[in-house]
From Swiss-Prot:
Gene name in the database record: rplD
Annotated source species: Photobacterium profundum (strain SS9)
One Gene Ontology molecular-function label: rRNA binding
Lineage top rank: taxon: Bacteria
UniProt keyword Kinase, yes or no: no
Family: Belongs to the universal ribosomal protein uL4 family.
Function recorded in the entry: One of the primary rRNA binding proteins, this protein initially binds near the 5'-end of the 23S rRNA. It is important during the early stages of 50S assembly. It makes multiple contacts with different domains of the 23S rRNA in the assembled 50S subunit and ribosome.
UniProt subunit comment: Part of the 50S ribosomal subunit.
Name this polypeptide is given: Large ribosomal subunit protein uL4
Biological process according to GO: translation
Amino acid sequence: MELVVKGADALTVSETTFGRDFNEALVHQVVVAYAAGARQGTRAQKTRSDVSGGGAKPWRQKGTGRARAGTIRSPLWRTGGVTFAARPQDHSQKVNKKMYRGAMKSILSELVRQERLIVVDNFSVEAPKTKELAAKLKELDLSDVLIVTGELDENLFLAARNLYKVDVRDAATIDPVSLIAFDKIVMTAAAVKQVEEMLA
């Protein structure tokens, strides 16, 4: 199949990478796993066994009229432990390489079908100036956009840092979440070829 390239001849690409059916279940599973892997998982609370103090019985068992109590660390008490305390845990999920590649191909194919993938011959700015990139994006009528280049262009990266809903990645660092998070994806022809090789 061929992809239209702005400012150059059409680019011949693999049907299996850019023209396959959309597998929603697979994409969902991979995106959820990717997001889960990004979690720190370092939250922690204290159970009644972790809270300091509480060795002595607060008051005697009978005769005071108060409810019986054996420790000030009880979850019923203020400053006591937490009943089902959170513990540090690893949230990462295993995703097979074949599944990951399949999900990426599904997403790229769907972007092509929805005309959200724009392929350009080259995309760069002369200086690391936000104003220059903003003007270029306005000219192309792009606002919510991920720009993917073959190699990371430092000028382009620095120019995009202060723009809302604009991100710059090189082909090697794109992921399922970044591809579905933006309204439009602008890829250079070199990036398309690189992505195709990565997912082959």
